[in-house]
Amino acid sequence: VEDQDEGGRVPSRKSGRHSAPEQKTIQIRISGKVQRVGMRNCIRSLAGRLNIRGEVMNLPDGSVLTIATSDPILLEKFISMIYACPRAVIRDIDISDHPLTHFADFQVRRTES
């Protein structure tokens, strides 16, 4: 068991300060009727509300790809909220780990480059 302060927080081993929440990057591939229905803008809006950083783009196969970085709890909430995007008909969401990527913000890209 690690040492905790009175607030139950565990100090960072490097600086002695309290550590920031763990960051994780995931890749989310969404298939179904997800292009030309406002899906990328919906995802950008959700990301903004949850302070998630990353990018979303259409893929040539008709799916939408999102790369998202945040703490794991917020990423889980983000994934569950994607299903509520209006006009989209989601057939499948495939989630995989992605190398940790630090984004300045969350952007909509036209296509994968």
Residue ranges and their predicted role:
Residues 2-113:
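Intrinsically disordered, low-complexity, mixed-charge
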